[in-house]
Amino acid sequence: MKRILLILLVMLLIPAGVRGGTVSYPKYTFGAEWGYIGTFYSGYHYNFYAPEGYRMDPRGHEFTYDSNAEAYIHAGYNLSEKYNISLYMGLSALREYHHTLPLSIRLTRFYGEDHMKDRIFAFIDLGSGLSVKKNPQEILTGKIGGGYRISLSRNTKLDFMVSLRSVLTHPDIDYYGTEIPHEKINRNNAYLSAFSIGMALTF
């Protein structure tokens, strides 16, 4: 009986993918992702008190183009051979506004039965984060995209992806060369739309 219990304990401690049990794919994933961000649209709505004392309420939108970069690390869990859910955290830049520390959850759907073969995939990513500035504020972000996965080995995958994203952030307000103090700001919302091209290495 003791020998049987010991064998069962060892089997529970060894991941199923290692012992060649019910699943042929690794259950846990880790990796890094790098990308280019091309922001093509931005809108804003500010409400603040000017240095002269009166209240300002500017708002507007514009189609311009700005280039930025981003980098993430991620850890996830393979729900099946076709679905993965992962937590992403990293560093990203938003136009000339500021850098951000995003944290998001991504659900990925892979197409194809065999994880050892190259496959296409689609994903949706939703999250929040903090702006990196004197007075940090929360940001909200969402993206949807897809890509192509190259299977380098059972555990190592190389991904190439494209996506569209929307971001709500809160930049500092510059009023004719004067930065408005945080306590004088009632609203500093900015909305950004962008596309991104990236690559990732997953283990």
What do the predicted segments below correspond to?
Residues M1-K27:
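Cleavable N-terminal export/targeting peptides
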Residues G38, Y72-K143, I150-T156, L201:
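Gram-negative (and chloroplast) outer-membrane scaffold detector with strong preference
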Residues L12-A16, T141, K157-D159:
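A broad helix-preferring feature
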Residues T39-F48, D57-E62, L91, I144, ...:
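Predominantly the C-terminal beta-signal and adjacent terminal strand-loop region
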Residues Y28-T39, T100-R106, M161-S163:
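Conserved long hydrophobic alpha-helices within structured protein cores
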Residues R19-N78, K133, A194-F203:
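Short glycine/proline- and aromatic-enriched beta-strand/turn motifs that initiate or cap beta-hairpins
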